[in-house]
């Protein structure tokens, strides 16, 4: 079984999302001894944001692409291939300014491809082409967004839900770490998230 472990936080030491996702992956490896983990660290190897030339290449039939266009889509193709090759996905990320870090948004832009990860029907609807698989999303935020007055400010969770569903993935499991900006609340939030991992059916 193949696991794609996507890491987003640029904080390599002391990141709450990294700590909890690493714990989750360790738990998964205990349950699935043959688990093959592929780590995609977007903070260390950020994907370029899409430009006009690359988008044009996406919508050019593969057999009609120039060498330059083939080169332009190669990285995106690799991201899509990694997605298709995985049976499990663990995504760990902070919430920044109510939403996604731009490196994570870039990943979604690279893997959301007409004809590869979704298709249009004759009626104009869209159908995801990635077979449903289990996704664990470990999300850390400086303030509390899972309850209280700021719930509606959370733009991260709805985007992640819709973006994965867009390509056909609906089995999403969120593990939230609220209040990481304050050492006192962080010291409660991280163990709480780890306990929630222990309670999950994985």
Curated annotation (Swiss-Prot):
Coiled coil: none annotated. Gene3D superfamilies: 3.40.50.360. It is an enzyme of class 1 (oxidoreductase). Its EC number is 1.6.5.-, 1.7.1.17. It comes from the Bacteria. Pfam families: Flavodoxin_2. Binds 1 FMN per subunit. FMN binds at residues 9, 15-17, 95-98. Its cofactor is FMN. One of its GO terms (molecular function) is oxidoreductase activity, acting on NAD(P)H, quinone or similar compound as acceptor. Keywords: Flavoprotein, FMN, NAD, Oxidoreductase. It catalyses: 2 a quinone + NADH + H(+) = 2 a 1,4-benzosemiquinone + NAD(+); N,N-dimethyl-1,4-phenylenediamine + anthranilate + 2 NAD(+) = 2-(4-dimethylaminophenyl)diazenylbenzoate + 2 NADH + 2 H(+). The keyword NAD applies. Belongs to the azoreductase type 1 family. Quinone reductase that provides resistance to thiol-specific stress caused by electrophilic quinones. Also exhibits azoreductase activity. Catalyzes the reductive cleavage of the azo bond in aromatic azo compounds to the corresponding amines. Homodimer. This is FMN-dependent NADH:quinone oxidoreductase 2.
């Amino acid at each position: 079984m193949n696991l794609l472990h996507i890491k987003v936080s640029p904080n390599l030491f002391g990141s709450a999302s990294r700590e909890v996702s690493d714990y989750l992956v360790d738990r998964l490896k205990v349950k699935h001894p043959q688990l093959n983990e592929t780590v995609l660290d977007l903070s260390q190897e950020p994907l370029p944001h899409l430009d006009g030339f690359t988008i044009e290449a996406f919508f050019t039939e593969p057999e009609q692409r120039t060498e330059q266009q083939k080169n332009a889509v190669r990285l995106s193709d690799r991201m899509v291939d990694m997605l298709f090759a995985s049976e499990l996905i663990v995504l760990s990320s902070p919430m920044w300014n109510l939403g996604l870090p731009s490196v994570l948004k870039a990943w979604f832009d690279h893997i959301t491809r007409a004809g590869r990860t979704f298709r249009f029907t004759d009626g104009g609807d869209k159908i995801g082409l990635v077979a449903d698989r289990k996704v664990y999303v470990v999300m850390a935020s400086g303030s509390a967004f899972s309850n209280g007055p700021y719930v509606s400010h959370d733009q991260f969770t709805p985007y992640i839900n819709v973006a994965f569903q867009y390509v056909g993935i609906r089995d999403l499991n969120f593990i939230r770490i609220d209040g990481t900006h304050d050492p006192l609340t962080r010291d409660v939030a991280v163990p709480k998230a780890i306990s929630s991992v222990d309670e999950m059916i994985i």
